[in-house]
């Protein structure tokens, strides 16, 4: 009877260990996916920042061109 109880405890511990190992495995997979998504998001953010910098630079050039060579400058309003 004592051996049967020990075997039942061993089975319960083994089942619990398997459950915990399974959870850890899923968490590791989720962590890998989150890490990959974060890396991709950082790349997209860096590309967007570079694009924004470029667009602001181009906008500045357009503004300078418009102020240097006004086309049909409107008359002053008093």
Swiss-Prot record:
<comment type="similarity">
    <text>Belongs to the SlyX family.</text>
</comment>
<protein>
    <recommendedName>
        <fullName>Protein SlyX homolog</fullName>
    </recommendedName>
</protein>
<dbReference type="InterPro" id="IPR007236">
    <property type="entry name" value="SlyX"/>
</dbReference>
<dbReference type="Pfam" id="PF04102">
    <property type="entry name" value="SlyX"/>
</dbReference>
């Amino acid at each position: 009877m004592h051996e049967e109880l020990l075997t039942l405890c061993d089975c319960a511990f083994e089942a619990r260990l398997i459950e915990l190992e399974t959870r850890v495995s899923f968490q590791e997979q989720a962590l890998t996916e989150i890490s990959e998504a974060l890396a991709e998001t950082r790349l997209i953010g860096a590309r967007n920042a570079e694009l924004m910098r470029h667009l602001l630079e181009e906008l500045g050039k357009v503004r300078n061109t418009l102020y240097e060579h006004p086309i049909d400058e409107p008359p002053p309003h008093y």
